[in-house]
């Protein structure tokens, strides 16, 4: 979705714009049915990145407003149920954020994050080793507990290098195709970076 959005925002022909718009809609349908809440949330930084670096911000704003307005109408029932399920407590172990109770899956994820931060101090430099701690659903927390501060620093450095190089291509290229691809990759990277908070993305 991010890549075809990048192409849509950089192409100059109406025919190609319609093609990329159609592809974006086509890709969005199965994306919604993944029922992945972390992936849905990652759309926000993806769109924000497109707005930040694209020269066609007005078009994006119109599409965002339209999408938000149509979402309650067009979203399938199963997706709405997935969202409402997030805030329904199912046991005494469900966590509360303020006055909002979370479902068991979200609660277990947050509890595991807290345990990671608590146990991290026992092996802060090199961590517990790959698979040495147990399953953790969250890339950054998993990297921190398994590879320690050194592994975390290396991960952030790699992510920074990827983003920097793709941004360089976008800013310096005069070819619309490469600029569109780079813009889409920037947005995709932002989405994956955000997705990594709540899932093992990489």
Role assignments for model-derived ranges:
Residues 84-143, 147-157:
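TM-adjacent membrane-interface loops and short helices in multi-pass inner/ER membrane proteins
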Residues 1-54, 64-67, 161-171, 177, ...:
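Alpha-helical transmembrane segments of multi-pass inner-membrane proteins
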Residues 31-34, 54-99, 114-122:
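A membrane-periplasm/extracellular boundary helix in multi-pass inner-membrane enzymes
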Residues 1, 38, 144, 148, ...:
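Membrane-interface micro-motifs in multi-pass membrane enzymes
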Residues 34-39, 135-137, 198-202:
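Membrane-interface catalytic loops of GT-C/OST-like multi-pass glycosylation enzymes that act
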Residues 55, 147-151, 197:
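Loop-to-transmembrane-helix entry motif
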Residues 4, 70, 82, 112-115, ...:
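Generic recognition of well-ordered alpha-helical segments
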């Amino acid at each position: 979705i991010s890549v075809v959005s990048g192409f849509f925002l950089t192409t100059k022909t109406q025919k190609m714009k319609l093609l990329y718009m159609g592809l974006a809609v086509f890709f969005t349908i199965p994306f919604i049915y993944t029922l992945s809440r972390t992936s849905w949330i990652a759309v926000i930084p993806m769109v924000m990145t497109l707005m930040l670096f694209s020269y066609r911000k007005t078009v994006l704003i119109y599409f965002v407003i339209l999408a938000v307005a149509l979402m309650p109408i067009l979203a399938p029932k199963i997706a709405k149920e997935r969202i409402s399920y997030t805030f329904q407590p199912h046991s005494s172990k469900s966590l509360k954020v303020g006055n909002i109770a979370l479902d068991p899956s979200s609660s277990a994820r947050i509890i595991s994050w807290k345990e990671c931060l608590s146990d991290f101090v026992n092996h802060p430099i090199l961590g517990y080793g790959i698979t040495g701690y147990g399953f953790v659903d969250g890339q950054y927390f998993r990297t921190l507990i398994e590879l320690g501060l050194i592994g975390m620093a290396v991960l952030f450095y790699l992510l920074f290098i990827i983003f920097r190089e793709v941004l360089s291509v976008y800013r310096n290229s005069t070819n619309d195709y490469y600029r569109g691809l780079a813009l889409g990759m920037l947005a995709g990277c932002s989405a994956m970076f955000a997705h990594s908070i709540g899932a093992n993305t990489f």
